[in-house]
Amino acid sequence: LLSRMQRKPTWNDRFRLDVLRLQDMAMKTLDPLEYSEMAELALLAGFPTEAKKAMDEGYAAGVMGKGNNAGPHKALRDKANKQAADDAKNIASGEASAMKSKDGTGLVNLGYAYVTMDQFDKGISLMEKGIAKGGLKRTDESKLRLAIAYAKAGRKADAIKAFEGLKGND
């Protein structure tokens, strides 16, 4: 279903990271390209802990760090590890400014960052506050990420309800 969706002419590539997140939850193991793509996209999106986890999963599954890609995989893993450590040290400092912001974007992003750090309750609470605050450029994308957060937290009923409520056109 996820790969069929990406072949539609209306597919928007900005959802690629979300698709990889869903694949990661649904499948036992991704292929090396998907792990590295997920890590790269997560770094670009500002979620280094998610990137670190993707690389760690790939290495644990035994599909990363081999052959001609061993060097690039190690470099990406090192970059993700460094940025994740920095993010863990500095994440709390962003909370006050996200709360004061006119729109909920900062709260949604900060909340998802906490979710990637397995601080599900705190992260989901911030995401819900951000969505309720409004002013989001892409509300359905924020709701999609909240649904993913619910699923990662094991809140199946909330995840299903959130997924069912999505009405995006992309």
Residue ranges: model-predicted function:
Residues R7-L17, D78-A88, V115-I124:
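Helix-turn-helix repeat elements of alpha-solenoid scaffolds
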Residues L1-L2, N12-M25, E50-Y59, A88-A96, ...:
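Alpha-helical repeat scaffolds
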Residues K102-D170:
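C-terminal soluble interaction/assembly domains
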Residues N81-G106:
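Eukaryotic tandem repeat interaction scaffolds
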Residues M5-Q6, A42, Y114, Y150:
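Residue at a conserved register position within TPR or TPR-like alpha-solenoid repeats
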Residues E40, L44-D87:
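Long, contiguous interaction/recruitment modules in multidomain scaffold/adaptor proteins
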Residues K8, R21-L30, L43-A45, Y59-G65, ...:
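Solenoid-like repeat scaffolds
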Residues L1-L2, N12-R16, T29-E37, F47-E50, ...:
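Generic helix N-cap/helix-start motif at coil->alpha-helix transitions
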